Amino acid sequence: MKKFLTAFLVAFTGLFLVACQNTKTENNASNEANTTLTLKVGTAPNYKPFNFKQDSKLTGFDTDLIEEIAKKNGIEIVWVETNFDGLIPALKSGKIDMIASAMSATDERRQSVDFTKPYYMSKNLYLKLKNNDSLQTKNDLEGKKIGVQLGTLQENTAKAIKNAQVQSNKDLNIAVLALKNNKIDAIVADQDTAKGFLAENPELVSFYQETDGGEGFSFAFDKNKQKDIIEIFNKGIDEAKTDGFYDTLIKKYELE
């Protein structure tokens, strides 16, 4: 009887341990299946065609590219809207995990953030009223009033013009309105964004174009904290260019 009881207890204990191990394995597998990387992505939704609102929905070149890369890598994206000049502070404070907002990679910005490889190259385009014959080149802007978007490379470009009176705006639409009302003389903006304003405002024309001084638009992450994620997006940018998705976006948003 004693031998039988001992054998029973040994067998029961073995079955119990196996059951526990199976349950633990199933729970781990379930947890792994339910674990999804979530990234809070900051953007300034007033920079058409890269980031803007259409029927109250966030859209644009950057938005579509981020969503495509995220979908292929099982990443959930939570969009966080803010002003352009507030994006890096939001990144540094942990309110967002990355920036996707037509941000140019520069040495100054690299002091506080890391960038992916560039996904788009752009230029500066200068706008004026069609009936303003006094502005023909960049040199004609000396001492003039120039509208720009706050925190952009174009703001730095305008400030470098001799005696220029630079008006920095959180939204370029404000600058366009000021130009149409003769409160400023010109606007300096990213060429693709500027072309959108030209299409919507026939009284405006471009009169000068130049490189923007940056290395191209890139996605930004907090300094030395997201190396693995940066590699995912670098690979995603390459894949988008080889599988045709990138060209689809270029045509969709009428970019060069």
UniProtKB/Swiss-Prot annotation:
PROSITE patterns: PROKAR_LIPOPROTEIN (PS51257), SBP_BACTERIAL_3 (PS01039). It is found in: Cell membrane. GO terms for cellular component: plasma membrane. Gene3D superfamilies: Periplasmic binding protein-like II. GO terms for biological process: amino acid transport. Keywords: Amino-acid transport, Cell membrane, Lipoprotein, Membrane, Palmitate, Signal, Transport. SMART domains: PBPb. A lipid is attached at residue 20 (N-palmitoyl cysteine). Residues 1-19 form the signal peptide. InterPro entries: SBP_3_CS, Solute-binding_3/MltF_N. Pfam families: SBP_bac_3. It is a lipid-anchor. Its main location: membrane. SUPFAM superfamilies: Periplasmic binding protein-like II. A lipid is attached at residue 20 (S-diacylglycerol cysteine). Belongs to the bacterial solute-binding protein 3 family. Involved in histidine transport. This is Probable histidine-binding protein. It comes from Campylobacter jejuni subsp. jejuni serotype O:2 (strain ATCC 700819 / NCTC 11168). The lineage of its organism: Bacteria, Pseudomonadati, Campylobacterota, Epsilonproteobacteria, Campylobacterales.
